[in-house]
């Protein structure tokens, strides 16, 4: 060790330089040797020439450097001008706006989507030439059919919408209620539905059917049919099938438990005293479908006219029978149920209506009033009937 | 006299190499050189040269000795001056540090 120190310190600069060069050459040779081993291994394993390409293909995949083109030579702002056609409303929408539009149009979002759908259907029906009628029908059938096989949400949206008109008459204001029903091009819309008592109700062939009825109690109640008309107003604007399924649900709620199961999403079909569900659950379901004024049926009979009373329900039943007897397939459970009760419904019909006359809470429809004069005729309703004419016609 | 001097030189070299390896400086220098050579394209140049040699000799008949004989002179020549200078500088500093001991 001592000798080593001596030798190192005794070296002059030229010797040190020579040693440095030697070390450097050593290192370079090391690197070269390492590289040679690397290449040799690559050759023997057969991957040395893998990255070789011929000049032709090199030219093919050259990077393009021109204004307006990306490095592959494609025009990169093509998508800006692209437009997609909505499969639902068949409008063309800019590609960047298409996803939000589709969400609204197909009803994936909130309730606003359904409003949008309705608006589209309305505007389509205003100028029918825009889209073919088949399309329209399909859309509207989806909107307005709530058979038992339908999903819950359809029931949820549509039922309260119609029942709004029903419960609205309970309030003693003189408000007029517009219900912009849409189902523009459906052929059943133009049907003239014949009432059991020989009274024909005019349904409109016009596409947007503004339902106008008043909840005033001061209308004359001499006509026994008036009550029927008033309860049936909103339903008569529906097609027979729609009406039936709606009313079937209503009847269901008055005869059976009806609590919606969490697992099956179906309504309980047991009696009102069904032990599996509590009264609270039953009440919740009724409030859900019929609005806050609805209560359990057994309680209802003892309540005053602020509640949803039995006479109303029976009138509804009678309407259902009228409907069920029209042109429905007997295979459906709803219609078969109604036909069972038909005789009873007819019998109680007039008496019930007389009872309710005294309660002075009635609705009347403009279209029906005019329909009284022109019996059994197809007569389109005026799109927005003037308010005073209601009272004139009725009185 | 001459023999003893030669002997002394050899001893000195051995001692320096020992020191280089012990301190790990040799490994560091090697790594630095490799990085620098790849950076400056030395490796790619050599590779191109390798391809020529291999095509000349035939893929199956290439040996490591052939490659070393062909490549090493070229590799030495192709090292850029900047890399050479930097490396020599590092070696000199190392020697200066350990010569003072």
Curated annotation (Swiss-Prot), chain B:
GO terms for molecular function: chromatin binding; transcription coactivator activity. Disulfide bonds: none annotated. It holds the Pfam family EnY2. Keywords: Acetylation, Activator, Chromatin regulator, Isopeptide bond, mRNA transport, Nucleus, Protein transport, Transcription, Transcription regulation, Translocation, Transport, Ubl conjugation. The keyword Transcription regulation applies. Gene3D superfamilies: 1.10.246.140. There is a cross-link at residue 74 (Glycyl lysine isopeptide (Lys-Gly) (interchain with G-Cter in SUMO2)). GO terms for cellular component: DUBm complex; mitochondrion; nuclear pore nuclear basket; nucleoplasm; SAGA complex; transcription export complex 2; transcription factor TFTC complex. It comes from the Eukaryota. It is found in: Nucleus, Nucleoplasm. GO terms for biological process: chromatin organization; negative regulation of insulin secretion involved in cellular response to glucose stimulus; poly(A)+ mRNA export from nucleus; positive regulation of DNA-templated transcription; protein transport; regulation of DNA repair; regulation of RNA splicing; regulation of transcription by RNA polymerase II. InterPro entries: TF_ENY2 (IPR018783), TF_EnY2_sf (IPR038212). The keyword Iron does not apply. Component of the nuclear pore complex (NPC)-associated TREX-2 complex (transcription and export complex 2), composed of at least ENY2, the isoform GANP of the MCM3AP gene, PCID2, SEM1, and either centrin CETN2 or CETN3. TREX-2 contains 2 ENY2 chains. The TREX-2 complex also associates with ALYREF/ALY and with the nucleoporin NUP153. Component of some SAGA transcription coactivator-HAT complexes, at least composed of ATXN7, ATXN7L3, ENY2, GCN5L2, SUPT3H/SPT3, TAF10, TRRAP and USP22. Involved in mRNA export coupled transcription activation by association with both the TREX-2 and the SAGA complexes. The transcription regulatory histone acetylation (HAT) complex SAGA is a multiprotein complex that activates transcription by remodeling chromatin and mediating histone acetylation and deubiquitination. Within the SAGA complex, participates in a subcomplex that specifically deubiquitinates both histones H2A and H2B. The SAGA complex is recruited to specific gene promoters by activators such as MYC, where it is required for transcription. Belongs to the ENY2 family. This is Transcription and mRNA export factor ENY2. It comes from Homo sapiens (Human). The lineage of its organism: Eukaryota, Metazoa, Chordata, Craniata, Vertebrata.
